[in-house]
């Protein structure tokens, strides 16, 4: 590896002959924060095959037959922590990543997985909050102007066309305040936006604004002008056949399947001496009767033969099922050229549902920019029905939070709906229902996408730490796990995803990061008579010193621990929850923020209610302590970067939310569902799996690469940092024998391989490229 340390992939104790799931770095590309480099990107990691050339600008030497590094970076500005790669989306068909940052959307070409390169930049005139792709479209959200509390926007673009090197803007749609998440659904015909509605003092209007948290749906119709894919695709669909009487494994109960398959596409022609053409995508499956499943997708075409010294063609992707048919088998890999073996088969079509593409007839709505054939209809979904006093009382009793109720003295209004802050979006398999996390509120909203209504708000409740280990103090200056049987915390999930088990039951997975405690300010000019600032947390010791809890609680083991700085005395507890209604200045109970792990909730298909089926407990924090003790509960980035080294931040987050499990990605590999968890604090990935026939996850390993032995600035200059620098990386998913992991760990016994990646959220996405299952992490 180019970082000078072995790959560390970590796992729980397994038998010596058993293997665990891990990651292996394939390539990493540093992105500029101002303009495209003139001389090409930094060289990537070497590939397999004959000897490749050396990489310029820090690129690694190619392996046998692998590509050399790119030309040196002769243009563009590169710097640490500049928000270059905040969110990303990946087009598997064209092998292009769309990476959104503070000033640009940058298009990265991964057709050469060893040596990716930036092929286009789109100036965005402001930061990109989130980005998604589907079909011929790319969509990203941006906060409002001139102030972040103003209405934000959704930008819809035609995808990058390699032939014209253009990416045309189609639509600009007003959404809600702080549009933090975007997701396509229903065959690219629907875009869902979560508008967080964060409050703040508007310096332009001289008002304190607490916008409504809302959800925007944008229904699309018409067509775009982008040319056809370079991949040869067979468009002959299989006819719908007789439906089976039992559902396919992994599909919802009560569904059936029409098994007819479409034909496979033809393989592309190899180009001497370059890479062979990609096999065509298999035909789309036939349509079954609703709610039956559509036909199985066709087998992907055979990849083209590689030229001398070139890469073999990738097998075609299996055709998608129709509604929601099983995906087709991946095509056979093409024959390799000199020095190469045959390419691996392409990805089989996913079991996710596929809808007809965007209707070709425009809707009676707004016509998009630059086209007379694309139109959209916007719907705004609010939470007003939950403002009824009975609803507020019901939800608060279930620990659905409303942290801010006017504590700064602003005129308001301070309705319950204004306190709700949607953050992340996931979907059921039919893409009829959206599940949207309300992190600050410790809840998940269930949204009917066909009727544009919120069905319910589901509470995430509390996590009790009885029997579990936790290091909840930064004052002990080290790793000190203790057990507090009376300690409770709010999970407060950030990212959420879904998966189906073999019985067809739906599970919602949550990354229980815990919300960042609110620290709000309002000038006396805008909030006359107010306190000027509001904080929703206080250290545990203050609850005891000020006698804010009932005497039995103060005398309990929990109260005694809260009196000790090295136990729970320096831990942060909520000042807006557990309040005594008869005496609001006192508390009946206390709660910390975050679950320090992930959870899986089983969804009732009739009531839509969720039941906790599994929680990761304390495994993530304990595994970080075991394998990365030097940066345990550390910070991903700290100032001043020219002096601070990553290991200096050790234990700094223990009093708060600990590891901060922030993001999620779920995928299928060789029959196993894999769950990747982005851990913000130490910038690592925890890997869990759900085996065929099982319903709940099992911990696999912990992954991290890089160094911690120099300042952040020095690590960046030596290309040994990750996400703080604004990079995009590809990792191969591999099985590693446990004995090999132990041997690898022996080369770095102090666990000093870790490196900061950034303080912002991970963005993880999956792709099948060059026969390998890869994880792309915006880093």
UniProtKB/Swiss-Prot annotation:
What Pfam families has UniProt attached to this entry? choice_anch_I
Record: glycosylation sites: 203, 234, 369, 451, 609
- List the biased-composition ranges (Gly residues): 262-351
Q: In which tissues is it expressed?
A: Restricted to the primary mesenchyme cell lineage.
Give the keywords, sorted: Cell membrane, Glycoprotein, GPI-anchor, Lipoprotein, Membrane, Repeat, Signal
**Cellular component, GO annotation:** plasma membrane; side of membrane
Range of residues in the leader sequence: 1-15
Q: Has UniProt tagged this entry with the keyword Lipoprotein?
A: yes
Subcellular location, in the record's words? Cell membrane
The function of this protein is: Not known. Could be involved in mesenchyme cell migration, adhesion, fusion, or spicule formation.
What's the protein called, per UniProt? Mesenchyme-specific cell surface glycoprotein
Q: Which organism is it from?
A: Strongylocentrotus purpuratus (Purple sea urchin)
Its organism's taxonomic lineage begins at:
Eukaryota, Metazoa, Echinodermata, Eleutherozoa, Echinozoa
